[in-house]
Amino acid sequence: MSKKPVRVAVTGAAGQIGYALLFRIASGEMLGKDQPVILQLLEIPDEKAQNALKGVIMELEDCAFPLLAGIEAHSDPLQAFKDTDYALLVGARPRGPGMERADLLAANAQIFTAQGKALNAVASRNVKVLVVGNPANTNAYIAMKSAPDLPAKNFTAMLRLDHNRAASQLAAKAGFKVGDIRKLTVWGNHSPTMYADYRFATVNGESVKAKINDQAWNKDVFLPTVGKRGAAIIAARGLSSAASAANAAIDHMRDWALGSGGEWVTMGVPSNGEYGIPAGIVFGFPVTTENGEYKIVEGLEIDAFSQECIDKTLAELQGEQDGVKHLL
């Protein structure tokens, strides 16, 4: 028996990440090859953006995806989020020339307050929300705080790109197959302060840390390379990472919806006080996922260097959160 279509809302749908994302969702890569989807696409109410969205929709139609049960174009979040089961909040205000971080936070607070309120009003009560638009953790926090009738746990931020970047760097360093790496995680904020932690990671049952055994490389090469990878891509390409970000969003949502099969993945989720992170802060943690729910991996030892890294990324997140509290 064929499954009932689910509704997937994507904001910033005509942007670079949206363009790299939508065709993969429509082909079944995110929710499974047996799950029909209705795409509910949101763009700003600007003629150029809406025309670009029309062009993307024409291309989606021309792919004749068997799983694509419908496509809608919207400029109002109250329509785009109606009854949605999954919401990927990709659209955000990028930092412009001469723009202070406080201005960026304020501009995004406006966007994500409105979207949080719209989700609260019209989305499915079980909606799974992934914030991709930066600053992702704080934007997820804003949306969550603006949707008091939805469970806080339904709001997540994307740290999977950092996780995937870390896995790739480890594989290159030690000659592993990237798909064989297990129990890797990224703590904290999706920013250069994130802490990619391979102390527990294994490849075919063997310790990655023991194989690499180089704390200087970890501190001086690995962490800065992963943390500043986005900036390196902008410098090389002249544009921000879009395809890799879309890929990470697919990974995040697929694992959340379909389960991670017992494997650790990284998600930015609201803390309940785990590892001393104050409750309510949206923080990158190691999680496992099953039956549409995620569970933070608890009981991991945090050594002095790791604690220092976690404290640093937490302080940055608390600073961002304090910077938007008056706007909520």
Swiss-Prot record:
Active site per UniProt: 190 (proton acceptor)
Pfam families in UniProt: Ldh_1_C (PF02866), Ldh_1_N (PF00056)
Keyword set includes DNA damage: no
EC number(s) recorded for this UniProt protein: 1.1.1.37
GO terms, biological process: malate metabolic process; tricarboxylic acid cycle
Reaction catalyzed: (S)-malate + NAD(+) = oxaloacetate + NADH + H(+)
Gene3D superfamilies: Lactate dehydrogenase/glycoside hydrolase, family 4, C-terminal, NAD(P)-binding Rossmann-like Domain
GO terms, molecular function: L-malate dehydrogenase (NAD+) activity
Top-rank taxon, per record: Bacteria
Annotated residues for binding of substrate: 95, 101, 134, 165
Oxidoreductase listed as a keyword: yes
CDD domains: MDH_chloroplast-like
Keyword annotations of the record: NAD, Oxidoreductase, Tricarboxylic acid cycle
InterPro entries recorded: L-lactate/malate_DH, Lactate/malate_DH_C, Lactate/malate_DH_N, Lactate_DH/Glyco_Ohase_4_C, Malate_DH_type2, NAD(P)-bd_dom_sf
Positions of NAD(+) binding: 12-18, 108, 115, 132-134
Function: Catalyzes the reversible oxidation of malate to oxaloacetate.
Family of this protein: Belongs to the LDH/MDH superfamily. MDH type 2 family.
Protein name listed in UniProt: Malate dehydrogenase
Organism name: Delftia acidovorans (strain DSM 14801 / SPH-1)
Phylogenetic classification of the source organism: Bacteria, Pseudomonadati, Pseudomonadota, Betaproteobacteria, Burkholderiales
Gene that this polypeptide is encoded by: mdh
